[in-house]
Structures are given as C-alpha cells and as structure tokens.
C-alpha cells in the first residue's frame, strides 16, 4: 500500500486496500480498487457533480462510492455480488460518512433506478455479463430518457469491441491516465454516452427487458 492510498483511506475513514480473488471466476473478476490517483483525475474532469446519481458496478469495498460521494457530493450506489466483500462495504459505511449506499445483487439481475445518470466500471465481470448489464441500463433509459454517461476504467479490448456495437451508445471522451502508470495504454477512462435526445418525443418508452437484451447484444 502506497502512502497516497493510505492517506485517502484514512481521510475517508474506510479500509479498501488490497486485492481479493477468493471468489473470482471466468465471469466475475477479482476485487481490486481503482487507484486514488485515477479517482482524483475523474474528479478533476467535472463529469461527476452533486446532482448526479452514480451506479458503481462491482463496487467491492466501496472506494469509488465513498470518494465520489465525499469529493463530488454525488449520490452513489454500489452493486456487489460477493456477500463477504459486501459486508466489508457495509463496515466501511459505518465509519465513512457519505451519500453512498450498497446493494447485494448480481449486476445482470439488478434493475437500474431511473434516476441513475452515471455508471462506473473497472472490469468487474466478463463481456458476456456486460451484455446483460447493458440491457438493464437501456431498459432504465427507455423508462426515463435522460443523458447517461458510462465510464470504463482500464477497459479491455473485449469491452471496447462490444461497446462499439451498441447502436444507442456514442463515444464521448476519454480521461488519460497513462502518465500515472508507466507503459500501460489501458490506463484510461473511456466514456460513452446515452444522449437525452436519442428518441423523438416525450415520456417513457415501454420496451420489455427481453427486447432490450436483444438490442444490446453484439452482432
């Protein structure tokens, strides 16, 4: 653990350091927190504000949630499937004062609240699960059309290839982080958007989840 990591954990009154792969498999990847220096860069981008609701997929012990809640003032929701790690997030919630809340659920089964407008991913699961998660996000979007930003830290080629096939998504920007870590081109946050004006007309669009899932699958 670096001094910088320790400093932030102490400031936020949480314990999130270390890697945990005890329950990892080919579909659900190990717990590894986003480095604080990357979160600082995300904060500096201005993409997360007080009136935003951030959904953190594979939140682990809650580092992203506590940081963005404290530094940006946003409401954050962390989704975690591993009950043991989820309990660690709840323990952090007792000491870290923030607007963060945590849900024990599988990402592909979680109904995305219709006020969520930011989604954060740090390679939490396989691209097969991402297909289903994207369908859930689109279902929420159709129920309440709004601008949503999807942020992918350290994205894999498989993730990028799939995301480029989702018709509803637009590439928005990227936050470069390769200067923070030597020689790794994956050190960046790719940002995709669901624009508010994707559809003509007002009001909710009644699209069943099964239909959305078909729309979001890669060709």
Task: Name these PLM-found stretches.
Residues 97-106:
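Conserved SAM-binding strand-loop segment of SAM-dependent methyltransferases
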